[in-house]
Curated annotation (Swiss-Prot):
Keywords: DNA damage, DNA repair, DNA-binding, Glycosidase, Hydrolase, Lyase, Metal-binding, Multifunctional enzyme, Zinc, Zinc-finger. PANTHER family: FORMAMIDOPYRIMIDINE-DNA GLYCOSYLASE (PTHR22993:SF9). Its cofactor is Zn(2+). Monomer. SMART domains: Fapy_DNA_glyco (SM00898), H2TH (SM01232). Its EC number is 3.2.2.23, 4.2.99.18. This is Formamidopyrimidine-DNA glycosylase. The gene is mutM. It comes from Lactobacillus gasseri (strain ATCC 33323 / DSM 20243 / BCRC 14619 / CIP 102991 / JCM 1131 / KCTC 3163 / NCIMB 11718 / NCTC 13722 / AM63).
Length: 276
């Protein structure tokens, strides 16, 4: 699933391709992608102009005139790309926005898990999925005091805690494994048992890792591509994710992989301390 750095990269690369364009027609080939009534969705967006694209957590927010916002969640495999309207439809293309300038934006999703929800601008934070999201890394809301207080109330393990989007949004399996390794914390550690100095280090590593991953245009380990069809660069910097069975770059111990709440989790059994 695209995490915050990937979704932000999609936003940055997609914006110059579609900003200012007006929708002339919409083709919906797989209606379940649309949360609204598909006919109403088409009616409201036809002749509307894209003003800009914002993002919150893993959600893209397409801003239109007349106070409309399309909330788009890419889920596991969703991708946007600009094409000519006469380009043959791809097998996994499910929604097409044809613009008045003769170009078209298509949404491609192998698993069909992505969703688009048209709402009134200003109400998007009340929509399902977004309304319970916690703060993003590298924001004023995500400060050290907030993070310390949040962890002190959690009995569950730190891996599941960091994946909880109500605590901090935008982190997924890849970056959680990476920040826990950098912080030398075992993924099964009790969140509330981690020492204060280690929590501070973890907080700093979350912010730094997300910032660097975003600068590197995200991580491509499976199918992730930006709006220009280009891969990310952070996969070259991964230390544990995808490296189970290899030597830890810090101590040489063989990295292990376990399941944590059904999620594959790679860690160093020597470097990463288990706090109970």
């Amino acid at each position: 699933m695209p995490e915050m750095p990937e979704v932000e990269t999609v936003r940055r690369t997609l914006t110059p391709l579609v900003k200012g364009k007006t929708i002339a027609k919409i083709n919906i080939w797989y209606p379940k992608i649309i949360v609204n009534d598909p006919a109403e969705f088409v009616k409201k967006l036809t002749n509307k102009r894209i003003l800009k694209i914002d993002r919150y957590g893993k959600y893209l927010l397409f801003r239109f005139n007349d106070d409309l916002t399309m909330v788009s969640h890419l889920r596991m495999e969703g991708k946007y790309h600009l094409v000519s309207p006469d380009t043959p439809k791809g097998k996994h293309e499910h929604v097409e926005f044809i613009f008045t300038d003769g170009t078209a934006l298509r949404y491609d999703d192998v698993r069909k898990f992505g969703r688009m929800h048209l709402v009134e601008t200003g109400t998007e934070r009340k929509t399902t999925g977004i309304r319970h999201l916690g703060p993003e890394p590298n924001t004023a809301e995500f400060n050290l005091k907030y993070f310390v207080d949040a962890l002190s109330q959690k009995k569950k393990n730190i891996k599941n805690t960091l994946l909880d989007q109500t605590i901090v949004c935008g982190l997924g399996n890849i970056y959680v494994d990476e920040v826990l390794w950098k912080s030398k914390i075992h993924p099964l550690s009790s969140a509330k048992a981690i020492p204060a100095d280690k929590v501070k280090n973890l907080y700093q590593n979350i912010n730094h890792t997300i910032a660097i991953a975003t600068k590197e245009r995200g991580t491509t380990v499976h199918t992730y591509l930006d709006a220009n069809g280009e891969i990310g660069g952070y996969q070259k910097m991964l230390q544990v994710y995808g490296h189970a069975g290899e030597e830890c770059s810090s101590c040489g111990t063989i990295l292990e992989k376990i399941k944590v709440n059904g999620r594959g989790t790679t860690f160093c059994p020597h470097c990463q301390v288990l706090y109970k």
